[in-house]
């Protein structure tokens, strides 16, 4: 990915609604939201807020409390942070409760393609997961790190076998804790006939390794192909436990989630048809060429409203 100074790869590599509920209820009524739209739990990932804040020359790390308040103001119910240590959970817990924001999922980095590093990585995730479960987390999302962030290298077959084995071991241990592991990808895993992506699915047990479908990374990684995205959905739809939501127009990310290159209405219909209602996480970020018309809260407010319309059928009574 090219674009913002803090791009997804550097972010992942270096980044060491009680108060808003009533207001959202009023906004929902004013915008004509149905009861199902209001009941839908919708979360957002940390990454979009970092790039929106950076674009506005604001320091994301200056006040986590401010970030959570902005999330609540946008009408979004949940937050999916990138967690690198158990201490972060200790910091997050009281603030989540104060600002009325849930944390049903977290995102963690892992290095799993090297046998000598996989055990350490698994241990770190399990320590984080134990803390996170205590504050309401049920899904652990991981994107096994590439050989080099932003590099052209692809993993060998042997490395893919090591990674799949480690991913399943992690999934089994998380399952024993009452948690679910959800595998995530970026574009690099779609290289070379998507061999890395497919082996993480085919080479692991669906009971212990589920899929965090990042629709736009699949779309972009396969050459901006909706055909490839919906083929992935056909192949692995029953394994989807989390769905990352991002949109583009003419292959450039938009400020707010809406109509665009990916037909999310068709995607939602397919998942409902097969009886799958995953955890929904907005990840509508900006990049080079994205419009610059909205502040972070307004952009997420619009994303929130559109997502609730498209995925209204996913609300759990």
Question: What do these predicted ranges mean?
Answer:
Residues 2-26, 30-43, 48-58, 62-72, ...:
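Histidine-acidic metal/acid-base catalytic patches
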Residues 16, 23, 89, 102, ...:
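Active-site acidic/histidine proton-transfer and metal-coordination neighborhood
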Residues 35-39, 68-73, 87-105, 124-136, ...:
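Acidic (Asp/Glu)-rich catalytic clusters
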Residues 44-48, 81-83, 105-110, 142-144, ...:
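A cross-domain feature marking catalytic cores of carbohydrate-active enzymes
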Residues 48-62, 110-122, 154-157:
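Active-site mouth loops of central-metabolism enzymes
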Residues 78-91, 111-121, 148-152, 187-193, ...:
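Acidic-and-aromatic substrate-binding clefts and catalytic sites of carbohydrate-active enzymes
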Residues 84-111, 160, 188-195, 264-267, ...:
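A short, hydrophobic/aromatic-rich structural module that often spans a beta strand
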């Amino acid at each position: 990915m090219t674009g913002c100074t803090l791009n997804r790869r550097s972010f992942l590599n270096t980044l060491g609604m009680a108060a808003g509920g009533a207001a959202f209820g009023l906004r929902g009524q004013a915008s004509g939201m149905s009861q199902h739209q209001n009941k839908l739990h919708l979360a957002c990932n940390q990454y979009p807020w970092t790039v929106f804040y950076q674009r506005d020359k604001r320091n994301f790390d200056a006040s986590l409390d401010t970030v959570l308040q902005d999330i609540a103001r946008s009408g979004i119910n949940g937050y999916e942070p990138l967690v690198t240590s158990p201490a972060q959970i200790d910091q997050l817990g009281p603030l989540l409760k104060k600002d009325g924001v849930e944390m049903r999922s977290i995102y963690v980095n892992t290095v799993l393609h090297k046998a000598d590093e996989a055990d350490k990585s698994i241990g770190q995730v399990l320590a984080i997961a134990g803390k996170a479960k205590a504050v309401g987390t049920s899904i652990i999302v991981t994107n096994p790190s590439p050989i080099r962030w932003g590099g052209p290298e692809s993993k060998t077959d042997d490395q893919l076998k090591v990674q799949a084995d480690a991913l399943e071991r992690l999934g089994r241990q998380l399952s024993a804790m009452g948690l679910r592991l959800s595998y995530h990808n970026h574009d690099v895993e779609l290289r070379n006939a998507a061999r890395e992506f497919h082996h993480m699915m085919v080479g692991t047990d669906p009971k212990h390794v589920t899929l965090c479908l990042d629709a736009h990374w699949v779309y972009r990684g396969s050459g901006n192909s909706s055909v490839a995205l919906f083929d992935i959905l056909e192949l692995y739809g029953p394994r989807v436990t989390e769905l990352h939501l991002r949109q583009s127009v003419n292959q450039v990310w938009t400020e707010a989630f809406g109509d665009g290159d990916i037909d999310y209405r068709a995607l939602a219909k397919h998942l409902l048809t097969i009886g799958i209602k995953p955890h929904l996480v907005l990840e509508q970020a900006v990049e080079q060429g994205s419009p610059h018309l909205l502040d972070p809260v307004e952009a997420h407010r619009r994303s929130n409203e559109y997502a609730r319309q498209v995925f209204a059928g996913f609300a759990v009574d």
